[in-house]
Amino acid sequence: MSFIKEFREFAMRGNVIDMAVGVIIGGAFGKIVSSLVADVIMPILSFFTSSVDFKDLHIVLKEATDKTPAMTLKYGMFIQNIFDFIIIAFAIFLMIKALNKLKKEEPKVEKVITPSNEEKLLTEIRDLLKK
């Protein structure tokens, strides 16, 4: 089997295509959540914290010189990324919970297995021998 055929079979499997769609949707969802945090949640927090912009919070480890920029520890961006993570994790949790609920609600159809003529005959013989 040629390399191209193997790759085509791999790429056309349902799982790979589903995963690709998931990655694309996940990237778009990440942008939406980042915008929600940066443009909605953080300004509200800034309002309640005396107009502090969390993105600008940092600790200067080494002052800037003529040749090098300042070395800073940007803990404000870290706080913002934590909010991103919490919201994304919560949204994924809600989606998985909804999917699990849908899976549980699906009615389980049980197959009724009808015995063959031989099985019926053998059952009758067994029952007669028990008497």
UniProtKB/Swiss-Prot annotation:
Q: Which GO terms of the cellular component aspect does the record hold?
A: plasma membrane
Q: What Pfam families would the database entry show?
A: MscL
Where would you find this protein in the cell? Cell inner membrane
The record ties this protein, via Gene3D superfamilies, to:
Large-conductance mechanosensitive channel, MscL, domain 1 (1.10.1200.120)
Membrane-traversing stretches: 21-41, 76-96
Question: What UniProt keywords are attached to this protein's entry?
Answer: Cell inner membrane, Cell membrane, Ion channel, Ion transport, Membrane, Transmembrane, Transmembrane helix, Transport
Q: How does it sit in the membrane?
A: Multi-pass membrane protein
Query: Out of the domains of life, which is the source?
Result: Bacteria
Q: Name one GO molecular function term.
A: mechanosensitive monoatomic ion channel activity
What NCBIfam families does this protein map onto? Answer: mscL (TIGR00220), PRK00567.1-4 (NF001843)
Oligomer and partners: Homopentamer.
- Please give the family membership noted in the entry: Belongs to the MscL family.
What biological function has been recorded for the protein in this entry? Channel that opens in response to stretch forces in the membrane lipid bilayer. May participate in the regulation of osmotic pressure changes within the cell.
According to UniProt, the name of this protein is Large-conductance mechanosensitive channel
Protein's organism? Histophilus somni (strain 2336)
